[in-house]
Curated annotation (Swiss-Prot):
Signal peptide: none annotated. GO terms for biological process: DNA repair; DNA replication-dependent chromatin assembly; DNA-templated transcription; nucleosome disassembly; positive regulation of transcription elongation by RNA polymerase II. It comes from Saccharomyces cerevisiae (strain ATCC 204508 / S288c) (Baker's yeast). Residues 154-170 have a biased composition (Low complexity). Residues 147-179 are annotated as: Disordered. It is found in: Nucleus. Component of the NuA4 histone acetyltransferase complex composed of at least ACT1, ARP4, YAF9, VID21, SWC4, EAF3, EAF5, EAF6, EAF7, EPL1, ESA1, TRA1 and YNG2. Component of the NuA4 histone acetyltransferase complex which is involved in transcriptional activation of selected genes principally by acetylation of nucleosomal histone H4 and H2A. The NuA4 complex is also involved in DNA repair. It comes from the Eukaryota. This is Chromatin modification-related protein EAF5. InterPro entries: EAF5 (IPR026226). GO terms for cellular component: cytosol; NuA4 histone acetyltransferase complex; nucleosome disassembly/reassembly complex; nucleus. Belongs to the EAF5 family. Present with 937 molecules/cell in log phase SD medium.
Length: 279
């Protein structure tokens, strides 16, 4: 994992484990997890949490699939010790009988550092996303060595000696595909939409209050319903972007925001259903 991500993971789990332990001690009538003014945590438990956490493993696997340098290795005990010392250079850390002690460190120090590092990481990621959006708007979406451009391959259908192909334009890009493949993708699209809309009907409600000042290039529901996606994955991407737009469009906690979050769960269920059906 990247240095920033590794620090956030270790810091968050330290905070979580100490908080959980303190709550347990308080419930049992004891004090907080400290000796004098020193916070304590089991290094073995911290390492196991990091190495076996489902979300962390998913992040590591995604970075491995993306061939991210130094992003596909799990953190070991020595890595964690180094990170802890780098996180708290002004505090002495000792290791005795598997217990990692943070001398003079208090919970509010951990919380303050966690907030600072999260805010810094978030700002960096937002800026990178903004740069990527500008690049995509300027140059289009690149896939492999080729770059997909609107209306590409138009006019190639009906070539002599080859089966007819159809150029199908979606709101995002053009596709040249075999009619049989197009028919299957249309069937898949209709099945997914019917399954998604049969749950609560909330999906269509996401498109009733567009806001171009917040979301660039919002997707139109009729385009999703009538255009043929280039692949199963592209349809999922389009649906996911529609929901993400709905989440980003509204203030956290509002009814519309909650609706978009609910649709996210419905999409996840629908995707799992379709995967099982295809298998």
């Amino acid at each position: 994992m990247d240095k920033e991500v590794s620090e956030l993971v270790v810091l968050q789990l330290i905070h979580t484990l100490i908080s959980n332990k303190n709550e347990e001690l308080v419930r049992n009538g004891g004090g907080i997890n400290m000796i004098g003014n020193n916070l304590r945590i089991s290094l073995v438990k911290l390492t196991n949490e990091i190495q076996n956490n489902l979300l962390i493993n998913e992040l590591t696997n995604l970075r491995r699939q993306s061939n991210v340098a130094n992003g596909n290795r799990k953190l070991g005990i020595n890595d964690i010790l180094t990170i802890v010392k780098n996180l708290f250079p002004e505090y002495r850390t000792t290791l005795n009988d598997g217990q990692l002690s943070l001398h003079g460190l208090e919970m509010h120090d951990i919380e303050k550092l966690l907030d600072e590092k999260y805010d810094r990481f978030k700002k960096t990621q937002v800026e990178q996303i903004r740069m990527m959006e500008d690049e995509i708007l300027k140059n289009g979406i690149k896939t492999g060595a080729s770059q997909l451009q609107p209306h590409a391959n138009a006019g190639k259908s009906g070539s002599a000696g080859t089966s007819a192909t159809i150029t199908t334009t979606t709101p995002h890009m053009a596709h040249s595909m075999d009619p049989k493949r197009e028919k299957l993708l249309k069937l898949y699209r209709d099945t997914v939409l019917n399954k998604l809309e049969s749950k609560t009907g909330n999906f269509q409600k996401l498109f009733k209050s567009p806001d171009g000042s917040i979301i660039k290039n919002e997707i139109n529901y009729e385009d999703i319903k009538n255009e043929t996606p280039g692949s199963v994955h592209e349809l999922q991407l389009i649906l996911q972007k529609s929901i993400t737009d709905g989440v980003m469009r509204k203030v956290i906690g509002t009814d519309d925001w909650k609706l978009a979050r609910q649709v996210q769960f419905e999409l996840d269920d629908t995707v799992q259903f379709m995967r099982r059906a295809l298998e």
